[in-house]
Curated annotation (Swiss-Prot):
The lineage of its organism: Eukaryota, Metazoa, Chordata, Craniata, Vertebrata. The chain crosses the membrane at residues 5-25. This is Protein O-linked-mannose beta-1,4-N-acetylglucosaminyltransferase 2. It catalyses: 3-O-(alpha-D-mannosyl)-L-threonyl-[protein] + UDP-N-acetyl-alpha-D-glucosamine = 3-O-(N-acetyl-beta-D-glucosaminyl-(1->4)-alpha-D-mannosyl)-L-threonyl-[protein] + UDP + H(+). It comes from Pan troglodytes (Chimpanzee). The keyword Cell division does not apply. GO terms for cellular component: endoplasmic reticulum; endoplasmic reticulum membrane. One of its GO terms (biological process) is protein O-linked glycosylation.
Amino acid sequence: MHLSAVFNALLVSVLAAVLWKHVRLREHAATLEEELALGRQATEPAPALRIDYPKALQILMEGGTHMVCTGRTHTDRICRFKWLCYSNEAEEFIFFHGNTSVMLPNLGSRRFQPALLDLSTVEDHNTQYFNFVELPAAALRFMPKPVFVPDVALIANRFNPDNLMHVFHDDLLPLFYTLRQFPGLAHEARLFFMEGWGEGAHFDLYKLLSPKQPLLRAQLKTLGRLLCFSHAFVGLSKITTWYQYGFVQPQGPKANILVSGNEIRQFARFMTEKLNVSHTGVPLGEEYILVFSRTQNRLILNEAELLLALAQEFQMKTVTVSLEDHAFADVVRLVSNASMLVSMHGAQLVTTLFLPRGATVVELFPYAVNPDHYTPYKTLAMLPGMDLQYVAWRNMMPENTVTHPERPWDQGGITHLDRAEQARILQSREVPRHLCCRNPEWLFRIYQDTKVDIPSLIQTIRRVVKGRPGPRKQKWTVGLYPGKVREARCQASVHGASEARLTVSWQIPWNLKYLKVREVKYEVWLQEQGENTYVPYILALQNHTFTENIKPFTTYLVWVRCIFNKILLGPFADVLVCNT
């Protein structure tokens, strides 16, 4: 009898444990269903989010998937889908062909050369490609029952969610502007991250971009074996990126940067508002220099001495901040009011985008690391409209560096290399240009600790910062371009058999009367018809008589454009055909 009682007790315990686990799994699934707004989330009105399941299934089975993309190649393409599906078992997206399916562009096998599009903003990286498999809609009869996602989805990859530079440059900025590229998307979309990473150290920043909780690929498995998106955008705009990381050629600024400080600062303003960081600035006399303190590697060994020297030189207090010890909102608050930001090279310097106009960025580089070869933060600071001063300082003294050859290879260790290679690296005075991402000499040098030579640092800063550093009230510096000159005309006169004159005149661009422009000039190109070369002229007036090399009874082509402040070149007006 006792044995039976014990057995029954054990059986009850096991059943209770199984039931408890089942209940917890059901609770987890229910939570995710709520996150998908399946009609039960108070902040997202149920009528707008519920899916009429029978109708949705009928549309999918009869009509199939619908896709229309923008962009000519996989590196600049964003696609808009209706009824795109995802198999959690196969970990593949599915395009179901039905009676009303549309696939534009219809690439055929070119869709695999190499992919339909990039899921991240790191261009043409073979781990970031997006594609789908194709099935007839009739195959749905033999597949798991689809779960329909009612949210408008923005589907993308995060490239490296544990690195703050990658988070801002590759993800947050592109997400912010992709959401604003399509009407209503910023207020309706839910972000789906498909790269397979966990949340990462900065997931809270992604949550600021949309009123709906982002979802990761791993979370989708709990929702069903087959998910179908009623409306989805796939891919990210790369238009805000300014740097390439060296996968094909050594790292450096992108060849064709399309973003300015204006767009960066609008994004920064959005982020500071979401983080509840004020824009009031600091009172007069309370200005400060902010020094980023690192706690694990790439240390400033004489940090206290550096703080004192900066305070004495610039007659303002110095403050330290670190990503490890401060909430990110506090970091942004300190950066956004700083007169100068000083930091070793590292991801924390992407916070430069929060600096006020007129502030100074001072980037410190360890021994043997050439600042000209690693410029993501210089490129950011020097974007037109950022209005920042940038200073790079490099440790030139090997005795002021502390190396760590015994560390793991990914933290700069080199003991895994043969002795000859170790000796070469130790004797090298500069890391050669290299590709990303495992160059042992680069890792060895970038993870060094540095004793900053303070006199040389102050001297380097003073070459750029002549007076007291700090934010300044500046007029809007984004250049406005002239329109076309108007009413261009020409008049010719002939004097004898070998002499002629050609007078060209025009009216100012119509937008000039609404602008305050420091200097206005005009560029005129003069070309004899049939010749391959032209003669350019820069003129201050709105008319000019040309006599040099003007031939009688000859046809000339004339182009005229306006130039503001020597660098803002307007468009050429329509070509003038002038006969002498």
